[in-house]
Structure formats: C-alpha cells, structure tokens
Amino acid sequence: MVKNLLVELGLEEMPAYVVTPSMKQLRDKMGAFLTDHRLTFEKIEMFSTPRRLAVRVVGLADKQSDLTEDFKGPSKKIALDADGNFTKAAEGFVRGKGLTVEDITFREIKGEEYVYVTKEEIGRPVEEIIPAVTEVLQALTFPVSMHWANNTFEYIRPVHTLTVLLDEQAFDLDFLDIKSGRTSRGHRFLGKETEISSADSYEDDLRAQFVIASPLERGDMIVEQIRALEEEHGVSIEIDENLLNEVLNLVEYPTAFLGNFDAKYLEVPEEVLVTSMKEHQRYFVVRDAEGKLLPHFISVRNGNAEHLENVIKGNEKVLVARLEDGEFFWREDQKLAIADLVEKLSNVTFHEKIGSLAEHMERTGKIAALLAKEAGLDANETADLARAAAIYKFDLLTGMVGEFDELQGIMGEKYALLAGENAAVAAAIREHYMPTSADGELPDTKVGAVLALADKLDTILSFFSVGLIPSGSNDPYALRRATQGVVRILDKFGWNIDLAQLLGRLYGLKFDSLSYDNQEAVLDFFRARVEKMMDRSTPKDIVTAVLQSTNFVVRDLVETAALLAEKAQEDNFKSAVESLSRVFNLAEKAQGQTAINPALFENQEEKDLAAAIEKVELTSDLAANMDQLFALSPVIDAFFDHTMVMAEDEAVRNNRLALLASLTAKAGQLAQFNQINTK
C-alpha cells in the first residue's frame, strides 16, 4: 500500500532568487533521504511561494524494504583457535554487527575460508521514519542566512509553520522551536491560517486562501493574463523568461495589469526606460506591432483584482519618479565633456591594491596597441582602437550610470556619439563589457573585440599580480567570467593568437602603476577555461594532452581535442599514439640538445626517420597535420626496432635524442602524445 507525504515549511518572505533553487534543493534532499531510508516512491512534486517551500511525495511505500546484508570477517584460521573454539577476533567481529557466534558461517574465497555473517533487518513502518524528515530541512543551505529573536540558529528567514501530513495523518515534530501540525498560512492580506486536510488537498486548501502553491501554475496564470491584456489593448508585450521567473517568485496570487506613463519620456533612450521598468520595477515592456516602445507597462500584483485602479496609480507614480531621474540625467549628462570625465578617472579607484581606473585604462591601451597588430587591424581600426582605449570608461562618472549601473557602456556609446566620436569608437565603448555572462553576447566589431580583450587581460593580470586569485567557488571580481570572455572572443574571431606567447609579451610590458606577476598561474587559469569549451564527451587524457601542447591558439586547441577524440575510434590510433609516446618519453632526455649531425647516423632507419621528420610541414589544416604525424608510425617503429637510442657513445646518443626532440617540437604543437592513455 502506498501513501502521499506532504512537507511544507512556512517562512517570512524569501528573496525571489532563492525560492526556486531552495525548492529544488528540498526535492533533491528529500529524495536522497527517502532512498537512504529504503523508502520507495513514485515521484516528488515541488511547491513554492515567497513564503513557503513544500514537497509532496507521491506513491510512498508504507514501510521500508527489508535489508539483508552479508559481512565478511577474518579468515577461518584467525577465527578459530587450535581447539576449534571461536577466538576473540571472531567474537569481536560478530558483536560489532549485533550478532553472535552462532550466526557465523564459512565461505571459501580463492582457496581460503573466511567468516561470514548475514544480517537481516525488517523494514520499519513509514510512520516511524517520518519524524526524521526535519533532518532534511536542517540540511538545506542558502546563499544568505539570518538570526531572529533570541535564537542561536540561522536560516534563510524566520520559520512560522511546519506542516507534515501522511495522507490525512498529521505529525507533531519540532523544528527550530516550531511545532509541526496541519496548519498553514494563507495569503498575507487576503487569506488566513488554514488547516490542510490531507496531502492530496494541499493546493485546493491553499487556493481557498488566495495562495497558488505551484510556481508553474502561477507562471501560466501570469502569461495568460498578459496575453489577455495584449489582446485587449492591441499591443505586443515582451515576456522575458528571467523576469517572469523572478516575478512569479514575488507573488502568491498573481494579477497582471496595464499601467501608463507620459509619452514625453519616450524621448529618453529606450535602454533607460527598459532598465527602469524591468530591472528596477520588475515591469514587462509594452511595444506596438512594429516593436516600437509604447508608454505603457505590465506589472503583476500579489493579490486579486479588487481595488486594482489604486494599485495601478501607485505603480505609475513610482515609475514616473524613476523616469524623471532618467530624463534629468540624460539632459544633464550631455552638458559634460568627455575629456573632463576622463581626467577625473584618476581619482576613481579600480581596486585599492591595483590603483585607479585611469591607470587601468593606460595599461589597457598598451595591451590594445599590441593586440591590434596580432589581430590584423588596419590603420583606421587601429586609430579607432587607440581613441576608444583612451576614453572608454568615461561614462562611469555620468549621472545616468551612477543611478543605473546596468547601463555602463550602453550610455557611453550614446554620449560618445552625441559628442562627435565616430561610430566605431562608440560601439567599442559598449562592446568592451561583452560578454556580461558566461554565455552572453560577444562583440561584433573587431575594434570592440580587441578593446574587450585588452580590458579583460589587464583585469586578470592585475588581480593575479596582487594575489587576488579565485579559489573554489569564490570569485568576487568575476575573473573566471573575464577569462572565459577572452577565450570566447578569440574563438569567435578565429584570430591566430597564441595565448601563451601573448601572455609572455604582456608580462614584458612596463608600467609605472603596476608590475604583472604570477604568469604561470594565469596560464593555468586560461587552460581551465579553454577546457570548459571542449566537448564534455572528450576523454580526459586527450584534453590533458592537448592543453599541454606548445600551441595555445584557442580554436586550434578545441579543434585538436575534437579531432583526437574522433581519431580514437580508428584502428590505427593506438599504434600511432604509442609510437609517438615513445618518442616523447625519450626526447625528454635530450636536455636542450637540438643539433642533428647526419654523419653520426649508423643505420638506414635513422636516416629514414630524419627524412620523414624533415617532410612534416605543419599548416593551418589540423586534420592534415595529424595525418602526417600518424603516418610516421611505421618509420618510428622501424627506428626503435633497429636503433639503441641510449648508445654508449655520447655523441651518437645525443644525436639520436636530438632527432627525437625535433619530432616532438613539431608533434608537440598538437598534443603531448605521451599523456594519452591507449591501454
């Protein structure tokens, strides 16, 4: 017989961003708890609002499954003394399992007998296990926690109720000074405390108190209401998924409505209006059929439609205050000179250990100049890059960005155009922030891409140089994102820039403000980011081999790893890699010996290998390069079959090691083949 179990935790309002992850965490931990306690179930349904986290376990077994376990003990010769009596070793073993020597049997394993005992545990009724579900609630982790009242414990928010029901049966449990039962709380204003009749009636009982417990249902309600408003008013409404997910975690009973604002504010840049509505007020944006912004917005009330006109007026009033700020800053910022703002950046701290923003920009400018040549920018693009690098942070001191920091770069582009800067310079100011997330949009222009690279590279090198290096999940300065941005930009534009060589050149730059340090740590940091770009199905040993190659062109690394993973399925892969691995292993003993003297060759196989290596010409065609190297396998094998590399004659030995090193110098540009496992 199966049952349904409901566990609901009632709290003060949680931050919207915490709700969904916490709900999923509760589901996962509850599932693990039940499995650990040998309780089978059909599925776990999730519920959440800003004021509750809940799960319903459907099809829960009414008792634990029985457990039969075999335990292996000491060997028979240790378990029995000379008289055939059980020794203390045997007695201690069974005592530890809660059994007696009478339960001992012997089993033969590889010709020797060992003590075995079988322990049987009869499954307990589910009612006896349920009180321990408070362990699940205690195990939940949150990004922030708090104390309340005089309690010593911490939790995401103060806990008010705990509802635990097995079908209709309520349980009296203790959790954080709260007694459980069947009581839950309705909507803060429209509902009241209510009794949950059973696990199955949970949604209906709360719905009667103006709480929609299912986040999926709340989301569907919001979308349906928005579409109805869209049809009613003949407009087009953007339903941003991220905004929708946030809004549905701000309300327990959603009611969407349309509000208005004065059309005069449409003269302010659209990005300002959209930011005011979406980021600050959590409003949905309204457009016409052609995509033009309209002086309306959609908001979602936490409640029903009663007195909705008052709610609309209140929201309109709040938004107007925001739009007034935006209009004011837009007007006043245009009175500022870019040169004056740039000059003031010397008084703005980039980081107390690193220096000012002006110093950061100076270093970025030098890096950008170096990258311009590497990326093949023409004279006009190089000039645009230099100008952009000289001013690109100026908008941080404008009133608009001070109020709406999400608009940094975006407003820089607009103000730059108004000040007469050309479009390429203005676009680069906006694009240098890209990508703003792990999979965010990348720059479209070469000038913007190079400026983004230079800015990110100085940021990474500067923080590493003063010891501010990410550890574990801690990355307060978003250096992983910056590094991933560098890697993704290089990959998108396909620039043949070797990151290792580039970093070497950057570490050679001299600045009055800072000296770069920690080069090897930075390189390892980049390797980790490149690895993230590789196909997850690529074997780890291939990834390692490729990342240890002497080539650090991002696109080449990614393509080489994919190519090797593909070739690993071919018949000749094992023999070719093993041949190359022997070369790599021995070449390590060359110790810098590079000069090859053909006069010291003592057999035809040496000459053949030297000639074959000479013919290997690496190009941009990675597949062709790999084919050339794999084709050397029979020549390499013949060489090893007829040649003693570590000859007694030092000159001959060094000559043979140098020959092998000449091959690894070429093959090592693709991978360190001796890192690939062929077993």
Swiss-Prot record:
Alphabetized GO MF terms: arginine-tRNA ligase activity; ATP binding; glycine-tRNA ligase activity
EC number, UniProt record: 6.1.1.14
Location of the protein in the cell: Cytoplasm
Family: Belongs to the class-II aminoacyl-tRNA synthetase family.
Organism: Streptococcus sanguinis (strain SK36)
Keywords: Aminoacyl-tRNA synthetase, ATP-binding, Cytoplasm, Ligase, Nucleotide-binding, Protein biosynthesis
One GO BP: arginyl-tRNA aminoacylation
InterPro entries per UniProt: DALR_anticod-bd (IPR008909), Gly-tRNA-synth_bsu (IPR015944), Gly-tRNA-synth_heterodimer (IPR006194)
Subunit field text: Tetramer of two alpha and two beta subunits.
Pfam families reported for this sequence: DALR_1 (PF05746), tRNA_synt_2f (PF02092)
GO CC aspect terms: cytosol
Annotated catalysed reactions: tRNA(Gly) + glycine + ATP = glycyl-tRNA(Gly) + AMP + diphosphate
Source taxon at top rank: Bacteria
Enzyme class, broadest EC rank: ligase
Protein name listed in UniProt: Glycine--tRNA ligase beta subunit
Underlying gene: glyS
